[in-house]
Regions:
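Conserved acidic residues
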Residues: 3, 42, 90, 121-122
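Short phosphate-binding loop-to-helix
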Residues: 50-116
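N-terminal glycine-rich phosphate-binding loop and ensuing alpha1 helix
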Residues: 2-48
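Residues that recognize and position ribonucleotide moieties
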Residues: 14, 100, 139, 189, ...
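Short, conserved phosphate/pyrophosphate- and ester-handling motifs at nucleotide-, phospho-/glycolipid
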Residues: 192
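Short beta-strand segments
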Residues: 8, 95-96, 126-127
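Conserved core of the sugar-phosphate nucleotidyltransferase
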Residues: 44, 102-186, 197, 201, ...
């Protein structure tokens, strides 16, 4: 059974334009993101847009050895469906490029848990009930389920955010993939200037890009002054 990681990336972020090509320790956030995913041992596809602004994203992703597809900016679900049709995985892991410190080992364990369940209709995620820091999120589902969502989802938030049609379906079985500790209060995602400030400090001064999930949380626990840099940031709600 072929599994692929599909990650979405674009330059035109509303709160932090060009964020995926901003740098920490001389390396772009997209490079950090893709490097962290190598621990999952899975092929990675970068789904970006057809906008000219995203040409550098496509060029860099290709240079780094990732697959690349380009599609609609706002209909991100169709972009993922395009990736599925082009690369033909049986199983999809969805992540987003605003997670430069994602833990590939955690992703791999999530894929194994999904496969062990033996149900192709299953939706699995470590964010159904949050225990991991925001920025380590991933989702696992069959390519067939993704294509079904692409055919049937009509609401704008469902198209823009890719998976709501799956995880809001009461009839669909779901598997939460919790951690043994609750670190959900921590934020190591990249959406605002404050997030970028924190990530740059974590990477450049504390080698966070070399730490696994447990190491990241231990680091944050030891430095509450760093946690405070972006503690006030509110995550966008569905439809925003």
């Amino acid at each position: 059974m072929k599994t692929a990681v599909i990650t979405q990336a674009r330059m035109t972020s509303t709160r932090l334009p060009g964020k995926v090509l901003r740098e920490a320790a001389g390396v772009t956030m997209l490079e950090h993101h893709l490097a962290r995913l190598t621990a999952a041992g899975l092929p990675v596809v970068v789904a970006t847009t057809t906008n000219l602004d995203d040409d550098p994203v496509a060029v860099l992703a290709d240079k780094l050895g990732a697959g690349v597809v380009r599609g609609s900016e706002h209909d991100v679900l169709s972009r993922f469906a395009l990736a599925v049709r082009e690369f033909e995985p049986d199983v999809v892991v969805r992540v987003t490029s605003d997670c430069p410190l994602i833990d590939g080992d955690v992703v791999r364990r999530g894929v194994d848990a999904w496969a062990a369940a033996g149900d192709p209709t299953l939706y699995a995620s470590n964010a159904l009930e949050r225990t991991y820091p925001r920025g380590l999120d991933f989702e696992v589902f069959s390519a067939e389920a993704l294509l079904e969502a692409d055919r049937l989802a009509t609401e704008t938030p469902h198209r823009e955010h890719v998976t709501p049609w799956l995880y809001t379906d009461d009839a669909r079985p779901k598997l939460n993939l919790p951690w043994e500790r609750d670190a959900s209060a921590y934020r190591i995602t990249l959406d605002t200037p404050e997030d970028m400030q924190l990530l740059r400090i974590l990477i450049e001064e504390h080698d966070a890009h070399r730490l696994d999930a447990a190491g990241l949380v231990t680091l944050l626990e030891a430095h509450p002054e760093l946690v405070g840099i972006n503690a006030q940031i509110e995550q966008k709600k569905l439809g925003q």
